[in-house]
């Protein structure tokens, strides 16, 4: 006799629901869904099927008319097509980049004299030169005080320079900024970029400047909340938010604030209600910092939608009803995050280790790499990078080398060169200069194989005119720890001087390494 269990409707725990189809066989079934989840309608009507089966005729362009156009007319046609595509894209999404959005006229009412701003006379470079170079130079001053940012015309000049860029230039620096933000190496660099955009936003609020939707700083605020969440999510936030014993709930609120899915039907507020709250309503500083970013992004999104509708300039003061922009001060995001992690105390070694690594600067952790083939793609480094990074090449079409040195050396390995073998190599190479055929290459290869087979500290290679410049490259380190790369070039018969190679190693005390991050919602993390 089969027994049937009868359950009351109100006795099920959260997230658990009866299986109507197989109650006797399966019992209970766990269902995970968000509050705004709506099942997709899989029914396809007969009219829709017939509509997709139809063959819609496409109007073909006359190639003869296109051939008759000049190059200038074709360029104009290309620009018209791009503008039409962006107009349709903006009408569809209402939030994407729109090239011809109207902005407020930058006339006499928005000059430094009219706004009461004094001229900047500090050490920072001219904004026009900074935007032209796209990246900061070595030892360039980028740290500025609050008074220098808010009471001078420096940011106003940045706004003028950004407004004067054409579409291609703006897209280029915009792509550089998005790439730099999404590939940030450390939490400190991410907070610096976020703080820069928030200060620029605050500058527009204080001086009541019109918002440009395609501005470099304004456009990237909307994606900063995700980078902020990804960097902070590396820590054990359930432990960081566990001061009152509700770390799991506070972490879910943190996910709702960023727009991440939360699979808990018993949350007190929905995602929309959490994002509408002011920063002061949250308990933890990290949540308050994210609330500032989310509020600024929401205001900018509303401004973009209003500009698309009215084609008129808009201002922050008309959309910030809670005066959140007035509460923000320069450097507040970094200060809130620092207070959150520096004041956290717990007995979890893994949590403390993750916080220590998050707050520390980025360091490369690479122990070896391969000699990639010559036809491999070339990875170029920025010319403004320090010299020690320029010698660290993973792959290059002409330099298949890999070397690394650190200034903080704790152990040095000195490789002594043997003078006798150098003399033998020199005699052999001078004898090879007369023969440029196949025998010369075979002798050289055999000689190198013999030298590599012997257990010696290092081998000094000499060159002749027959050695191609793309064969090999060696990096020598002088005694003063300055790195010099000696590349073998064609028609270069100079003798290499004795060099002492130093290999600098930077050791760090490694504690326990755990991969379990915020395990309460590990299945739901993005």
Curated annotation (Swiss-Prot):
Residues binding Zn(2+): 239, 344, 346, 351
GO biological process, one term: regulation of DNA-templated transcription
Domain of life: Viruses
Record GO terms (molecular function): zinc ion binding
Subcellular location: Virion tegument; Virion; Host nucleus; Host cytoplasm
Keywords, ordered alphabetically: Host cytoplasm, Host nucleus, Metal-binding, Transcription, Transcription regulation, Virion, Virion tegument, Zinc, Zinc-finger
A cellular component term, taken from the record's GO annotations: host cell cytoplasm
InterPro entries found in the cross-reference section: ICP27-like (IPR008648)
Protein name per its UniProtKB record: mRNA export factor ICP27 homolog
Originating species: Human herpesvirus 7 (strain JI) (HHV-7)
């Amino acid at each position: 006799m089969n027994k049937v269990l009868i359950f009351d409707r109100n006795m099920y725990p959260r997230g658990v629901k009866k299986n109507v189809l197989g109650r006797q066989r399966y019992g209970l079934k766990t269902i995970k869904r968000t509050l705004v989840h709506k099942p997709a309608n899989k029914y396809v009507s007969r009219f829709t099927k017939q509509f997709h089966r139809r063959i819609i005729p496409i109007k073909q362009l006359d190639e003869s008319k296109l051939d008759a156009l000049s190059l200038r007319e074709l360029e104009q046609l290309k620009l018209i097509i791009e503008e039409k595509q962006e107009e349709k894209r903006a009408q569809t999404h209402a939030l994407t980049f729109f090239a011809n959005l109207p902005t407020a006229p930058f006339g006499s009412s928005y000059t430094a004299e009219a706004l009461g701003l004094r001229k900047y006379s500090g050490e920072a470079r001219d904004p026009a030169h900074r935007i032209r170079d796209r990246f900061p130079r070595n030892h360039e001053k980028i740290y500025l005080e609050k008074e220098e940012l808010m009471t001078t015309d420096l940011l106003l000049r940045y706004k003028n320079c950004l407004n004067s860029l054409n579409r291609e230039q703006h897209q280029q620096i915009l792509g550089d900024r998005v790439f730099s933000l999404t590939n940030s190496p450390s939490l400190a660099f991410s907070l610096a970029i976020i703080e820069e955009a928030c200060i620029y936003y605050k500058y527009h609020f204080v001086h009541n400047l019109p918002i440009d939707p395609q501005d470099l700083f304004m456009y990237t605020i909307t994606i900063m909340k995700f980078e902020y969440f990804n960097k902070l999510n590396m820590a054990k936030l359930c432990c960081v938010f566990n001061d009152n014993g509700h770390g799991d709930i506070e972490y879910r609120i943190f996910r709702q604030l960023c727009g991440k899915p939360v699979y808990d039907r018993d949350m007190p507020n929905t995602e929309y209600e959490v994002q509408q709250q002011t920063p002061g309503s949250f308990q933890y500083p990290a949540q308050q910092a994210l609330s500032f970013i989310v509020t600024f992004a929401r205001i900018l999104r509303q401004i973009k939608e209003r500009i698309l509708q009215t084609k008129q300039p808009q201002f922050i003061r008309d959309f910030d009803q809670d005066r959140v922009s007035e509460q923000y001060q320069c450097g507040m995001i970094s200060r809130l995050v620092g207070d959150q992690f520096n004041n956290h105390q717990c007995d979890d070694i893994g949590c403390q280790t993750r916080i220590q690594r998050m707050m520390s600067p980025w360091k490369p952790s690479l122990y070896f790499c391969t000699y990639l083939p010559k036809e491999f793609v070339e990875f170029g480094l920025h010319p403004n990078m320090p010299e020690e990074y320029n010698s660290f090449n993973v792959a290059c079409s002409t330099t298949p080398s890999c070397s690394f040195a650190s200034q903080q050396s704790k152990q040095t390995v000195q490789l002594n060169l043997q003078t006798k073998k150098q003399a033998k190599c020199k005699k052999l190479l001078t004898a090879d200069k007369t023969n440029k055929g196949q025998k010369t290459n075979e002798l050289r290869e055999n000689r190198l194989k013999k030298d590599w087979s012997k257990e010696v500290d290092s081998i000094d290679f000499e060159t002749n005119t027959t050695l191609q410049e793309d064969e090999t490259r060696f990096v020598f380190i002088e005694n003063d720890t300055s790195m010099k790369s000696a590349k073998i070039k064609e028609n270069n018969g100079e003798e290499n001087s004795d060099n002492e190679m130093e290999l600098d190693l930077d050791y760090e005390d490694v504690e326990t390494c755990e991969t379990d991050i915020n395990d309460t919602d590990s299945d739901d993390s993005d």
